[in-house]
């Protein structure tokens, strides 16, 4: 059975062969938890230099798509530079990871040139003030209640939690969640306080005439409510729930980023932009069906590549009180779009899941494995086992996490180099 017809395949050899021998190929890959460990402090992230080199062998067939950012203190640019120990070498050799960050509104090329298509200066100025507000909110929160953290722990926790991203300032509570693991109610109150802060920021944006500029992203989440707002995943025993509270530019959603990347890919192949040269993720329609319709209307299906979507954040949870299924995860929508585009074009696109639950962040459900007739199989995915109508079909799984995926990716890159040099 071919890979796109399989569920949770562990045939990584076939996966490598697909990447190595498919000429018209587009890889759209998340970063954190996929090609590097999911850690509490983003400043401690590391990238394998050989993996970075391997991405260059895919040339214009590889793009990243992340809710993190390329630039800034916690940007991926610095992680790549650290991998090689020489920023000028990375820039000259074109070793930066190309693609979209901040959900789809921050573009970077191989040489580290960064832009924000469709973003106004007033919007960036508003975002620049957000990190200080997050810092002040955290200080007030801990100043208003008794807690067991030492001054040093609290300072470390706050510094690790405030991500001063240019286009997506974020409160990342991973470190504080770990420090507060014996005080679940304080952490639960902290989640609620962060959500209230983001609501307050939205109100301030509206007052300044920027009501249509931003939205709130929670990661991981439980999907969206009837108003289109993302639903927080509250912490529970052994599960830190939503840890990333992001104030993002509207249009900065990964599924819109898929269209922006596909638009660039077609231009690389044909010299023409199906959606126009100036198209950005911010111009994409908001609904899944409208995104599909736009692709069907503007992109030549005969030129459509085999798209490989790679992510690590997909959730589903059954509400114990109502029985309602909440499906979420920051990678769900872009992976679903890639799956549906494959169904439309009959190209057999692949949805690839990397199990990042072994990392420091404890809010992922690990894949469950069993040995059946001598073969290891995935018997339970990252969602709720009671969700029998899960629409997202994960084709290939990497239960060994980012190390296992990176090893396969590097192998595929070398095979591709040999295959297309003959």
UniProtKB/Swiss-Prot annotation:
PROSITE patterns to which the protein is assigned, alphabetical: HIS_ACID_PHOSPHAT_2
InterPro entries referenced in this protein's UniProt entry, alphabetically: Acid_Pase_AS, GGPPase
EC number(s) given by UniProt: 3.1.3.69
Statement: the UniProt record of this protein carries the keyword Acyltransferase: no
Organism superkingdom: Bacteria
Keyword terms: Hydrolase
Cysteine disulfide partners in this protein: none
Subunit structure: Monomer. Interacts with GGPS.
NCBIfam families, A to Z: salt_tol_Pase (TIGR02399)
Function: Phosphorylates glucosylglycerol-phosphate the precursor of the osmoprotectant glucosylglycerol necessary for salt adaptation of Synechocystis.
Protein name: Glucosylglycerol-phosphate phosphatase
Classification of source organism: Bacteria, Bacillati, Cyanobacteriota, Cyanophyceae, Synechococcales
Gene designation: stpA
């Amino acid at each position: 059975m071919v890979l796109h017809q399989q569920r949770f395949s562990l045939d990584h050899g076939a996966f490598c062969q697909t990447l190595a021998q498919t000429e018209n190929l587009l890889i759209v890959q998340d970063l954190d938890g996929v090609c590097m460990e999911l850690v509490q402090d983003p400043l401690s992230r590391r990238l394998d230099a050989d993996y970075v080199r391997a991405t260059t062998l895919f040339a214009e067939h590889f793009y990243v798509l992340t809710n993190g950012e390329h630039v800034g203190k916690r940007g991926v640019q610095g992680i790549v530079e650290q991998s090689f120990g020489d920023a000028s070498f990375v820039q000259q050799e074109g070793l930066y990871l190309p693609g979209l960050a901040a959900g789809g509104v921050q573009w970077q090329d191989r040489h580290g040139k960064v832009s924000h298509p469709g973003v106004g200066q007033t919007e960036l100025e508003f975002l620049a003030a957000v990190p200080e507000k997050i810092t002040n909110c955290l200080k007030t929160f801990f100043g208003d209640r008794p807690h067991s953290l030492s001054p040093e722990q609290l300072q470390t926790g706050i510094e690790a939690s405030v991500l001063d991203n240019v286009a997506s300032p974020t409160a990342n509570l991973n470190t504080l969640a770990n420090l507060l693991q014996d005080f679940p109610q304080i952490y639960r109150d902290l989640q609620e306080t962060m959500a209230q802060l983001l609501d307050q920021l939205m109100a301030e944006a509206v007052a300044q005439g920027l009501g249509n500029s931003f939205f709130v992203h929670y990661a991981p989440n439980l999907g969206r409510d009837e108003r289109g707002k993302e639903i927080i995943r509250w912490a529970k025993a052994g599960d830190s729930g939503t840890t990333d509270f992001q104030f993002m530019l509207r249009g900065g959603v990964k599924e819109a980023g898929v269209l922006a990347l596909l638009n660039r890919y077609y231009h690389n192949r044909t010299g023409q932009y199906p959606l126009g040269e100036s198209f950005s993720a911010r111009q994409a329609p908001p609904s899944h069906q409208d995104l599909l319709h736009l692709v069907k209307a503007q992109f030549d299906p005969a030129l459509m590549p085999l798209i490989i979507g790679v992510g690590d954040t997909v959730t589903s949870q059954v509400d114990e009180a109502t029985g309602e299924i909440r499906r979420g995860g920051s990678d769900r929508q872009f992976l679903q779009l890639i799956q549906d585009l494959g169904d439309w074009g009959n190209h057999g696109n692949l949805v690839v899941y990397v199990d990042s639950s072994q990392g420091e962040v404890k809010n992922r459900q690990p894949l469950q494995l069993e040995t059946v007739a001598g073969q290891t199989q995935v018997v339970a995915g990252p969602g709720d086992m009671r969700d029998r109508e899960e629409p997202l079909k994960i084709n290939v799984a990497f239960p060994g996490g980012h190390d296992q995926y990176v090893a396969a990716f590097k192998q595929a890159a070398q095979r591709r180099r040999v295959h297309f040099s003959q």
